[in-house]
């Protein structure tokens, strides 16, 4: 019998050296964070585990070196990152709630801001965290509304009081966010002015130099033309995990070969100012979208609307529109050309600026109506005007040789919102909301708006949107067909069977489009929710119109839990696509 070879000797893993200096502690945490970033698009849960370990490592650094600002800043940023990842509730300890995690992230950013008050990065992140807190309160389910927690078809003054309390909490968080972002804008403007002054001063020195200086210029062709090294983008800087100089770390380097951490501060540009201004206007729009027919007068007033309109106009006229217009002229403006934006990036920013204005105006028009400050006709006119083609800046003057101005259709500065799938979706939403308000008094007009504007807008958006956005659009199209089937006019009654069939086709389209392309982990979680909602609604159509429970039971057997079913149905009833009696039938059936 041949002798078996000896197995290779086992190599024992070397025990990693315990960190001793502030830089070594920080290096451990940064390595864990970078590992999380590598898994972020492929395995969200694995990324989350690395981020939790990184937070623990940053906290260990702070225990040893409490003055280490970099560990404090990175910890705050990661606490917020965890709130934005689509992690299942089981990922966190049972004592950890979404609200508690957002509050912890906000508090961590407040501490950073208290220590370093003139950092636009900290202020921007702090404002984003507070805005997310506002969104959480805006969408927070009321306690006890789930079926299994003893909820049911809630109503009455107590429910309204709780809703108002929730909306006021959301409004307060959004207002706090806006205030912090306003501070960020002030800091950015000061930084920008300082950068310009330094650039002009340095440019004067270079202009007065001799031939040797010119030779130096030739050697530095790869550097920024203002004399500095090429710096990372604003987004890279906001997400950077690099720490500042070790003298700020609260400890020594521990040797010449130790890792040295240094921050590269990018000069503030007009693009970073534009990003902050757009975020501010988005926050104000979010405040207005809190209004409902039942709550608007409880959380808003005429004076408040006037104030928020003044603030929004200031942001639009002084920052968003002129800066976006300048991007269009990048080729002729040395300052803008240094931003290095491609043509498609400029077009996207122009569209984003225009759409931010449009969405604010439509939200304002809706809230004004709920407060009794306008009529349905005025609301409709304001929505139509908001989505009209818009010019970021006036057309150029006509040539002296031509007596007539340049035709508007030939002027490339006109922004046509019908070329953007996002704008088309927003247009459909705005007209659907208007149609719902018109329905009780003028069902024919409601039908016309849905059939001639909302539905065609979504149809066009389907053709323009990237693949990963199609499931959400198909879901909206299914909801719209259900809504049309509920309108009490002859056309809807005669076409009800076709409308319900169309809704089913679109709901199945959600499922089909969700599996038709490679979708990242983060988008995949959102799309999974779309698929669940579509399957539940298609099953409820069968139950509501045929009395068939089997499709809904099949959905439940496939892994969609009862809480999810209840949440989808309850939301659909509130949106008017299912009758309240259907909610009662499903409640009784699920309890049985």
Annotated model-derived regions:
Residues 1-48, 57, 89-98, 219, ...:
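Eukaryotic N-terminal targeting leaders
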Residues 1-7, 377, 381-385, 395-592:
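Long C-terminal extensions of eukaryotic subunits of large macromolecular complexes
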Residues 19-39, 65-89, 117-141, 189-211, ...:
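Amphipathic alpha-helical repeat scaffolds of TPR domains
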Residues 25, 32, 143-145, 154, ...:
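Long, compositionally biased, phosphorylation-prone intrinsically disordered terminal regions
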Residues 35-53, 81-111, 132-265, 287-311, ...:
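Short coil/linker segments at helix-helix boundaries
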Residues 49-57, 70, 74:
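N-terminal interaction modules that seed assembly of large macromolecular complexes
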Residues 64, 115, 187, 464-466, ...:
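Structural marker of alpha-solenoid helical repeat scaffolds
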Residues 269, 287-413:
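Alpha-solenoid helical-repeat scaffolds
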């Amino acid at each position: 019998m041949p002798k078996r070879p000896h197995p290779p000797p086992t190599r024992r893993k070397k025990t990693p050296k315990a960190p001793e200096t502030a830089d070594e502690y920080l290096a451990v945490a940064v390595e864990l964070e970078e590992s999380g970033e590598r898994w972020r698009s492929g395995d969200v849960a694995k990324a989350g585990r690395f981020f939790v370990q990184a937070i623990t490592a940053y906290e260990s650094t702070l225990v040893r070196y409490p003055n280490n600002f970099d560990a404090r800043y990175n910890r705050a940023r990661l606490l917020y990152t965890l709130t934005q990842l689509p992690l299942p509730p089981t990922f966190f300890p049972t004592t950890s709630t979404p609200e508690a995690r957002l509050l912890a992230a906000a508090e961590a950013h407040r501490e950073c801001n208290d220590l370093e008050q003139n950092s636009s990065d900290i202020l921007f992140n702090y404002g984003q965290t507070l805005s997310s807190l506002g969104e959480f309160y805006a969408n927070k389910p009321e306690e006890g509304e789930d079926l299994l927690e003893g909820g049911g078809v809630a109503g009455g003054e107590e429910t309204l009081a709780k809703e108002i309390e929730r909306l006021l909490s959301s409004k307060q968080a959004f207002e706090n966010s806006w205030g912090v972002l306003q501070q960020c804008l002030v800091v950015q403007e000061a930084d920008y002015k300082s950068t310009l002054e330094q650039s002009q001063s340095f440019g004067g020195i270079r202009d007065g130099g001799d031939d040797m200086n010119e030779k130096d210029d030739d050697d530095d062709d790869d550097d920024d033309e203002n004399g500095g090294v090429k710096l990372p983008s604003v987004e890279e800087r906001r997400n950077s995990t690099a720490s500042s100089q070790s003298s700020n770390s609260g400890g020594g380097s521990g040797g010449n070969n130790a890792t040295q951490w240094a921050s590269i501060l990018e000069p503030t540009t007009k693009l970073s100012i534009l990003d902050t201004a757009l975020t501010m206007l988005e926050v104000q729009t979010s405040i207005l979208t809190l209004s409902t027919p039942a709550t608007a007068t409880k959380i808003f007033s005429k004076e408040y609307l006037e104030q928020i309109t003044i603030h929004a106009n200031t942001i639009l006229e002084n920052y968003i529109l002129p800066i976006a217009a300048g991007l269009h002229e990048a080729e002729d403006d040395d300052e803008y050309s240094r931003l290095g934006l491609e043509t498609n990036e400029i077009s996207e920013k122009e569209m984003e600026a225009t759409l931010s204005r449009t969405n604010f105006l439509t939200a304002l028009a809706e809230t004004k109506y709920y407060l009794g400050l306008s009529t349905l006709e005025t609301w409709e006119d304001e929505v139509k005007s908001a989505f009209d083609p818009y010019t970021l800046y006036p057309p150029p003057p006509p040539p002296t040789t031509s007596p007539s101005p340049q035709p508007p259709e030939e002027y490339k500065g006109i922004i046509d919102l019908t070329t953007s799938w996002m704008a088309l979706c927003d247009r459909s939403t705005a007209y659907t909301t208007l149609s719902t308000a018109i329905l009780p008094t003028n069902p024919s007009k409601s039908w016309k708006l849905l059939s001639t504007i909302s539905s065609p807008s979504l149809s066009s958006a389907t053709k323009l949107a990237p693949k990963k956005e199609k499931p959400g659009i198909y879901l909206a199209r299914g909801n719209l067909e259900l809504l049309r089937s509920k309108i009490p006019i002859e056309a809807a009654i005669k076409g009800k069977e076709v409308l319900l069939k169309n809704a089913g086709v679109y709901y199945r389209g959600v499922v089909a489009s969700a599996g038709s392309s490679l979708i990242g982990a983060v988008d995949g979680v959102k799309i999974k929710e779309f698929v669940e909602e579509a399957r539940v609604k298609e099953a409820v159509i069968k139950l509501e119109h045929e009395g068939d429970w089997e499709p809904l039971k099949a959905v439940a057997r496939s892994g969609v839990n009862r809480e999810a079913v209840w949440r989808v149905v309850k939301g659909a009833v509130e949106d008017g696509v299912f009758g309240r009696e259907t909610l009662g039938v499903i409640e009784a059936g699920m309890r049985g």
